[in-house]
A protein has these predicted regions:
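Flexible, small-residue-rich N-terminal segments that precede or flank a structured functional core
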Residues: 53-110, 149, 205-209, 216-222, ...
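Ser/Thr/Pro-rich, low-complexity mucin-like regions
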Residues: 190-210
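Disulfide-braced loops of extracellular cysteine-rich modules
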Residues: 34-48
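A short beta-strand element within beta-rich, extracytoplasmic domains
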Residues: 107, 116-130, 225
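Solvent-exposed, acidic/flexible segments
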Residues: 96-101, 113-118, 134, 192
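Bacterial signal peptide processing site
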Residues: 28-30
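Beta-strand-rich interaction/scaffold domains
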Residues: 128-195, 218
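Sec-dependent bacterial lipoprotein signal peptides
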Residues: 1-26
Length: 230
């Protein structure tokens, strides 16, 4: 059975939600193709660490001429190496006791003909009061290449993915919304690629505590797709 909250998310999926995490500020376009993953200030030379990527000062990810759209997932699944079935209220990404975790997200965006995707991010809200990870937690992102459904997806029955790429590093503190840059994947959706079935976020179980994020099942805000559209 799909949890009631997941069914509600599916019903809301076509509707833009202007709530939750505050918008990014800045101007320019998305990250350069060779922009590397970062976790904080002081690691990007002359550039800035914004939304998990090193970016030059003139290429920040929220253009002033773009509109911001927030979409909940049409479907989501949390696949934990040592976890149970179903979507929990919160998931601790990177927690060693839970093993590796794969978060599957499918969205139903409709940006209109001719829309230009300036930048796009998956936004995860931290679980209030959860302890911080003991160390930085690396995350990867991949394109989901075949159909899947939360009713049937399990750790042993995962959809096929593209080659994962480094996407973000979760900092120990402060506990702020995490933005994962998925701009190339969302641009592919706009081109109607037939082998696009959502986004997978992968976290290795390598920390004693992990970084806890809300799935929005009974409280808090679950994952959102934040897109800046021209």
């Amino acid at each position: 059975m799909v949890a009631p909250a997941v069914r509600l998310l599916a019903a809301l999926a076509p509707v833009a939600l202007l709530v939750a995490a505050p918008p990014l500020t800045g101007c320019g376009g998305a990250a350069a193709p060779d922009a590397h993953v970062c976790a904080g200030a002081g690691v990007c030379g002359a550039g800035y660490c914004v939304a998990g990527r090193c970016r030059p000062a003139d290429a920040l990810p929220s253009p002033i001429d773009a509109r911001r759209v927030l979409l909940p997932p049409a479907d989501l699944a949390v696949l934990a190496e040592h976890g149970g079935d179903g979507v929990p209220d919160a998931v601790a990404l990177g927690r060693e006791g839970g093993g590796d975790v794969v978060l599957l997200l499918r969205f139903a965006p409709d940006f209109g003909a001719g829309a230009e995707i300036a930048s796009a991010f998956v936004v995860l809200e931290p679980t209030p009061g959860a302890p911080p990870a003991e160390r930085a937690v690396p995350l990867e992102v991949a394109r989901i290449l075949e159909p899947w459904h939360s009713n049937t997806a399990t750790w042993g029955r995962q959809p096929r993915l593209s080659l994962p790429e480094a996407a973000a590093v979760v900092r120990r503190r402060p506990a702020t919304p995490l933005r994962i840059d998925v701009t190339p994947l969302v641009r592919d959706w706009a081109r109607r690629r037939k082998d696009d079935h959502g986004i997978a976020i992968l976290a290795p179980g390598s920390d004693a505590v992990g970084a806890a994020y809300s799935m929005g099942i009974s409280q808090g805000v679950g994952p959102l797709l934040e897109v800046y559209v021209r």
